[in-house]
């Protein structure tokens, strides 16, 4: 069964439509990359799929409408990493990651051994184990981003939605993050990740969905979506798309003089 399915989904802000109508699916064990220029509607779409923004049309999770799910039930099924990643409280990094286990615990209960193992694995994937005792407010922005990503991974949900999680990370940690998403997918979890790095998207995602002005401009395998023609049309850039090491590499080299 398709895990997450949106049909004729629309989102309006201030009475004006900003997303849709569009349709989108997410299968078990799949990493889907969400592409598009600034203002294309990526963040708004992810919020709607997380059940955090009112929407028209339909959006279902394993056949159940998102609108019919309680916040508690949704938190057991969907984890959401927003684009804003400022940590506003002085808590140890390990405690921050442990917050991802809240949906699975009774109020006031201690972490179980299973909880601790899941937290430790999430911290390992995001390379924040050495920061466990550091205050989250006293580490770098990139380290904060990785700690918050570890918290979302520790939520251990079938669906993970991540809004530009690689932004601000060094190249090694960008690759490590995408590799972590792939490892989650290999275990049957489903990931939608919005990205501006086209090479990361093309190399690590099973499918790509390109948005433009709130609608789907293209969808398919990376080689079908990341093309010079589409990049010119949607992003307004000239780009060289080549194959390096058996995977696509994308290099924007100038402005195309198109609509952007």
Feature map (PLM): residue ranges:
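Catalytic Walker B motif of ABC-type/P-loop ATPase nucleotide-binding domains
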Residues: 160-164
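ABC ATPase nucleotide-binding domains
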Residues: 232-260
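The feature captures the beta-strand-to-loop junction immediately N-terminal to the Walker
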Residues: 35-37
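Conserved ABC ATPase signature
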Residues: 110, 135-139, 143
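Conserved ABC ATPase "signature" C-loop
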Residues: 213-214, 220
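Conserved ABC transporter NBD signature motif
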Residues: 57-65, 74
């Amino acid at each position: 069964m398709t895990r997450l399915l949106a049909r004729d989904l629309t989102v309006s802000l201030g009475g004006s439509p900003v997303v849709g109508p569009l349709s989108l699916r997410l299968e078990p064990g799949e990493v889907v990359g969400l592409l598009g220029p600034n203002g294309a509607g990526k963040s708004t779409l992810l919020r709607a799929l997380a059940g955090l923004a009112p929407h028209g049309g339909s959006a279902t999770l394993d056949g159940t409408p998102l609108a019919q799910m309680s916040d508690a039930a949704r938190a057991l099924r969907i984890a959401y990493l927003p684009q804003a990643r400022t940590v506003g409280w002085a808590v140890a990094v390990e405690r921050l990651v442990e917050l991802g286990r809240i949906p699975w615990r009774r109020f006031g209960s201690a972490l179980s051994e299973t909880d601790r193992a899941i937290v430790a694995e999430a911290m390992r994937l995001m390379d924040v184990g050495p920061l466990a005792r550091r205050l989250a407010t006293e580490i770098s922005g990139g380290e904060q981003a990785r700690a918050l990503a570890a918290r979302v991974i520790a939520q251990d949900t079938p669906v993970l939605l991540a809004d530009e999680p690689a932004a601000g990370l060094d190249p090694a940690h960008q690759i490590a993050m995408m590799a972590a998403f792939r490892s989650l997918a290999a275990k049957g979890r489903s990931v939608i990740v919005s990205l501006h790095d086209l090479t990361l998207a093309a190399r690590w995602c099973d499918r790509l969905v390109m948005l433009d002005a709130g609608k789907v401009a293209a969808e398919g395998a990376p080689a079908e979506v990341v093309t010079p023609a589409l990049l010119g049309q949607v992003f307004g850039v000239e780009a060289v798309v080549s194959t390096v090491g058996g995977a696509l590499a994308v290099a924007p080299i100038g402005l195309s003089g198109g609509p952007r």
